Amino acid sequence: MNKGWLELESDPGLFTLLVEDFGVKGVQVEEIYDLQSKCQGPVYGFIFLFKWIEERRSRRKVSTLVDDTSVIDDDIVNNMFFAHQLIPNSCATHALLSVLLNCSNVDLGPTLSRMKDFTKGFSPESKGYAIGNAPELAKAHNSHARPEPRHLPEKQNGLSAVRTMEAFHFVSYVPITGRLFELDGLKVYPIDHGPWGEDEEWTDKARRVIMERIGLATAGIKYEARLHVLKVNRQTVLEALQQLIRVTQPELIQTHKSQESQLPEESKPASSKSPLALETSRAPVASESTHTDGVEEVAGSCPQAPTHSPPSKPKLVVKPPGSNINGVPPNPTPIVQRLPAFLDNHNYAKSPMQEEEDLAAGVGRSRVPVRPPQQYSDDEDDYEDEEEDDAQSTSSAIRYKRKGPGKPGPLSSSGDGQLSVLQPNTINVLAEKLKESQKDLSIPLSIKTSSGAGSPAVAVPTHSQPSPTPSNESTDTASEIGSAFNSPLRSPIRSANPTRPSSPVTSHISKVLFGEDDSLLRVDCIRYNRAVRDLGPVISTGLLHLAEDGVLSPLALTESGKGSSPSIRPSQGSQGSGSPEEKEVVEAVDSREKPGLVRPSESLNGEKYSPKELLALLKCVEAEIANYEACLKEEVEKRKKFKIDDQRRTHNYDEFICTFISMLAQEGMLANLVEQNISVRRRQGVSIGRLHKQRKPDRRKRSRPYKAKRQ
C-alpha cells in the first residue's frame, strides 16, 4: 500500500485542486503571508509546513514522544479524525483530511463521507491504514505530484526539488469542541493547545501558536511602545537618583555654592584643603584637556580621552598627582575629607552630594558638545575592581586599589584618614540627561555635564560613539547588549568585547558614585538587588511613578493588551524641581511575564531605594532598552528580507531569459551550448540508467559460477 505516493509541493492552487478531486465542494486553500492580520471569512483549519529535522529514515515512524500537551485519552482521540502517517510522502493528504474530516459543516462528497463514517471510532493507527488502502485518495494525490525521475545522475551540483521537499512536513491546526488541536501524523497523540479566549476567534489562538513555533511571536510586541515606556522609566529612575541626593544632603548645596563664588577654579592648587576638595580634580583634568579652539575641554568626571584608557575598560580620566598644573607643584599627599556619619560605612555615596552643589551653582551655563564622543564597554573587570574597593572600605583611610600602575582612581587618600571626592558631575549628568530625555523620548538620550565656573562642558551622546581603542572605530550599537531579564546570552566573553558598549549613563554615574561599576550593578543582579527584583518584571510594561518623598512605585495598568504606545504626561522641571508630576497610563502594552522573574502581587506598594539599588535598576533598564532596540532592528531587517524574497518570487524572468537566449543565438553560441548539454546528458543521464538495469542480472549470473566453484 505504501508504493506510489509522491511528494506534493506547497502550493495553495495545488491543494485546492486536490480538495476538489477528493469530492469536497465549497472549500479552497489560500496561502497566508501575514500572521499578524486577522483571517477574513470562515476558516476551517490551518496547514503548517515546516522543515523536518530528523533523519530521512525516521519519517516512516511515528514519534513516541509525549509531553503534557499530548492528549492520551482514547475516547477523545478516537472521536476526532486523527490518523498516523504510515505512508511516506502522504503528509499533504493527511493534513487536508485532518482539517476536512473534523468539520461538521462542510460538504465532503461521497469519498470522504464514506471514509469518515467507516473510520468512526477507529484508533489513529487504524485510520492511517484506512488512508493507505484508499485508492481514490492515492490517485487524486499522485495526479498533482511531480513525476519522479526514473534515474538520477551520478553527480549533481545541487539537490533536486524532490529530495529537497523530503525534508519538509505538513501538520494541521483544527478547532475541535472549543479547543485548538495540532494534528501531526508523525506523532503518536494529538497536541492540545487549549481553548481560545472569549473575546477572540480560534484563528487568533492558532496564529499565536504558529508564531511562537516559528519564532515570530515577538513580532506581535510593539517594540516602539516598549521602548517608549522603558525610556520614560529610565528618566524616572534618574529623577529618583537626583531627588534622593537632594533630600539626603541639602546642606552641602549652599556650602559649595559659596565656595565657588569666592575662589575661581583655575587658581586653586591640587593640594587645596577645602571641605569638599572638589577643585583638586578639576584643575588637573581641565588644564590637561584644554584645546586652543575652546571646544574640547573635559571635566574630571567626564569619560573622555580614550587614549588614557585600556581598550576594554574606558575609565574616567583623572590626571595623576605627579603632574604640574599651571606651574604649581603637585602635592603627593592630598587632603581627603570624611563622608557624613550615616554614609561613612557605605560605598554607594562617594560624590553625589558634591554634584548637587555643581548643579546649584552651574545652572544656565553654556554647554558645548564635543566632537569625538566616548565608547563604553561592558567589562567584567570593572566589577572586580569595585569588589576590591568594597573590601577596603571599612578602614577610616580609604584607599582604592587598581590593577595596574598609572590608573588613578576617583578617590585619593592620605594619612589623616580624610576622603577626597574627585568626581563632581553626577547631578549634572542626571539633570542634563533628564532635560534631554524630555525633548524626545524616542531617540537615544545624551549626557551633558558642566564642570564649574569658567570651564566649558562636554556632551557625551549615547549613540555613534567610537571604540575606546584609538586605532579602530566600532560600528556596533547599543542594541547589541543582551536583555537584563530575558536574554541568556550574557557572558564574560561578550562583556569583555571592547566594541560592545554598556549604558553611558549608568557606566558614568556608577563610576562617579562608586569609583567603578559596583559588583552589585551587574546585569545578573536580579537575585541580589531589591529594586530590580521588585520593579524588574514590570519595567517594560508599565510606567514608574516617583512620589515627592522619594517612593518609587509602578502605576496600575488601566488597559492592558492593547499593544499601543502609552500616553503619558511627562514630568516638568526635572532639573530644578525635586517633585515631578505624576505620570498616568492611558494605554499600556501587553504585560507578558519575563522568564526567570516572579511577577509581584497585584497590589504593588512603592518603596524607597538606595542609590546603589537605583543604579542597578537603571542599568537593567538600559540593558532592556538595548535588547528591544536589537529586536526592533531585527524585525526591520526581517521585513526587508520578506519584501526582497517576495519580489524575487513574483518577478517575471521570461523576458530576461528570452533576451539572453536571443543574444546567444546572435553570437552563434547557442547551437554549441545545446550540443554540449545533450552530450553531457547522454554520458550521465539515460545511458547510465540503462547500463545499471543491464548490469544487475549480469552480476548475478557471474556470481553463481564462483559460488559453485567454492562449494
Swiss-Prot record:
Official protein name in the record: Ubiquitin carboxyl-terminal hydrolase BAP1
Query: Which residue ranges have biased composition labelled Low complexity?
Result: 269-278, 563-579
Motif extent (Non-classical PY-nuclear localization signal (PY-NLS)): 699-706
Q: Which GO terms describe its biological process?
A: cell differentiation; heterochromatin formation; monoubiquitinated protein deubiquitination; negative regulation of DNA-templated transcription; protein deubiquitination; protein K48-linked deubiquitination; regulation of cell cycle; regulation of cell growth
Give the catalytic activity: Thiol-dependent hydrolysis of ester, thioester, amide, peptide and isopeptide bonds formed by the C-terminal Gly of ubiquitin (a 76-residue protein attached to proteins as an intracellular targeting signal)
The UniProt record lists the EC number as 3.4.19.12
The annotated regions of Polar residues compositional bias extend over 462-506
Q: Where is this region: Interaction with nucleosomal DNA forming a DNA clamp with ASXL1?
A: 681-683
Q: How does it assemble?
A: Core component of the polycomb repressive deubiquitinase (PR-DUB) complex, at least composed of BAP1, one of ASXL1, ASXL2 or (probably) ASXL3, and one of MBD5 or MBD6. The PR-DUB core associates with a number of accessory proteins, including FOXK1, FOXK2, KDM1B, HCFC1, YY1 and OGT; KDM1B specifically associates with ASXL2 PR-DUB complexes. The BAP1 deubiquitinase activity is not required for PR-DUB assembly.
Residues of the site described as Important for enzyme activity: D184
Record motif Arg-finger motif, residues: 56-60
Q: Which GO terms describe its molecular function?
A: chromatin binding; cysteine-type deubiquitinase activity
Region Positively charged C-terminal extension (CTE): list its residue ranges. Answer: 695-711
Phosphothreonine modified-residue sites: T475
